[in-house]
């Protein structure tokens, strides 16, 4: 299934322990229908070398709503920009 939420979009959590938090989408797993949001579902992991590490966990796609879509920048060719300025 194709997801409407893409990497870089701003979303708000609507259910769960992090309800009401807003963040930017870091990663999307379309097969499992899960997304990773910055600052939401922060998990702590202990590593022998680095000590305690904090990392965002994946949350279900249905638990968030889209606030602002990821912006797409228009690609312009060099020829088009030269002809406009000339």
Curated annotation (Swiss-Prot):
Purpose: One of two assembly initiator proteins, it binds directly to the 5'-end of the 23S rRNA, where it nucleates assembly of the 50S subunit.
The protein's name: Large ribosomal subunit protein uL24
Entry keyword RNA-binding: yes
Binding partners and assembly: Part of the 50S ribosomal subunit.
Disulfides per UniProt: none
Residues in the signal sequence: none
GO molecular function per UniProt: rRNA binding; structural constituent of ribosome
UniProt similarity note: Belongs to the universal ribosomal protein uL24 family.
GO cellular component: ribonucleoprotein complex; ribosome
Ranges in coiled-coil conformation: none
